[in-house]
Design a protein with these regions (language model features):
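Catalytic alpha/beta core domains of metabolic enzymes, predominantly
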Residues: 147-286
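Active-site loops and adjacent core secondary-structure elements that bind or stabilize anionic groups
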Residues: 12, 272-273, 286-289, 294-309
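Short, basic, helix/turn surface patches
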Residues: 131-133, 182-189, 255-262, 296-309
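N-terminal amphipathic alpha-helix/helix-capping segment at the start of soluble metabolic enzymes
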Residues: 7, 11-43
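Active-site beta->alpha loop and helix N-cap motifs at the rims of alpha/beta catalytic domains
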Residues: 31-160
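Alpha-helix-loop-beta-strand connector modules within alpha/beta enzyme cores
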Residues: 88-100, 216-224, 295
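Solvent-exposed alpha-helices and their adjacent loops that cap or buttress functional pockets
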Residues: 21-24, 94-95, 119-123, 144-147, ...
Length: 319
């Protein structure tokens, strides 16, 4: 395969009917909801991957329905704790819907097992690896390279330099030579040519705002689709967790869903919005944000595409 990444400001990737990228206001934001996450109440055994199929299907269908209504494409973020579990989950998601899916785990062995299974059964056109990052070892990368998976999240986490420059350097040149290669080159060596650039959001007070700022820098330099799992910011905010425990659950939900708006307003093309259970509230929030951006960008072009809830303003609206 040609392992050279494409380059061009405002790159638009198309995967299983999902368009991602472009200029602000051009395409609707892509939302990825996580299913089978740790502690998910539809799972009966996280090690073997036993779960309630009926409830899982309802959650997936709810997200797909919200995607159809708003025009915001969706991705199923499949998390599995073990090799056995993630293979079961991917098999199930592959059967019940036709949407792209993320292969996600805290275990490198599980991620590889998921990638290999997707390759074996012909699901690579829908599969997105999560993720290629500075901690990935050679065996994992070599195994990924043996598959036909061509899309991956590229995590810009830099533990030694959490600045915008540090994140950009991790992608470009391995943090100015601290690592043998930059993550973009590592990804290309694995056969990846569709990059989803994750700005690696950290807790408030530890660089959360820097990650949002990195969105602008990445779009300006490379133009690859960019986003993050920014919903992790509220979950790592000690004060908010305590406030939630004190009986203010609604406030937590507002901050959790609202965090996605921040990512979109800073030029993000995708958000990993957290539990798929929140699809019915995450999609309207992001769709509204997309409409704000599309209106703001209407004078500059390009024209908004596939934003089902967006109506272009008439000249009179500007008076």
């Amino acid at each position: 395969r040609d392992r050279s990444p494409s380059r061009g400001l405002g790159d638009v990737y198309k995967r299983q009917g999902v368009k991602m990228g472009g200029q602000p206001g051009e395409y609707p934001t892509v939302l990825a909801g996580t299913i089978f996450y740790g502690g998910h109440n539809i799972i009966s055994d996280e090690l073997t991957g036993d779960f309630d199929k009926s409830r899982a299907e309802t959650l997936v269908n709810d997200m797909v329905e919200m995607s159809d209504v708003t025009g915001n494409p969706c991705i199923v973020q499949v998390f599995g704790q073990t090799e056995e579990a993630i293979v079961k989950y991917i098999e199930y998601i592959g059967d019940i819907c036709d949407k792209p899916f993320l292969i996600d785990s805290t275990s490198g062995d599980a991620r590889v097992a998921g990638a290999q299974y997707a390759d074996e059964v012909g699901l690579t056109e829908r599969a997105i690896y999560n993720s290629i990052n500075m901690a990935a070892d050679k065996s994992e990368l070599d195994a990924l390279a043996e598959t036909d998976i061509s899309a991956s999240i590229i995590l810009g986490f830099n533990p030694m330099n959490a600045t915008v420059d540090g994140k950009m350097a991790m992608w470009e040149n391995g943090d100015d030579g601290a690592y043998e290669k930059g993550l973009l080159e590592v990804a290309a060596d694995c056969g990846i040519d569709k990059f989803m650039m994750d700005t690696a959001v950290t807790p408030l007070g530890q660089g959360a705002g820097i990650a949002a700022k990195t969105t602008f820098a990445e779009k300006a330099k490379w133009g690859y689709p960019v986003g993050s799992g920014i919903h992790n910011v509220p979950s790592a905010w000690d004060w908010l967790r305590d406030y939630k425990k004190a009986g203010n659950k609604t406030a937590y939900t507002v901050c959790d869903i609202g965090a996605n708006i921040v990512q979109v307003m800073t030029g993000g093309d995708f958000v990993l919005f957290g539990p798929i259970d929140n699809a019915k509230i995450a999609f309207p929030a992001v769709a509204q944000t997309d409409m704000f951006i599309a209106e703001a960008a209407a004078d500059f072009g390009p024209e908004a595409v596939d934003c089902l809830l967006y109506t272009s303003p008439s000249p009179r609206d500007g008076l």
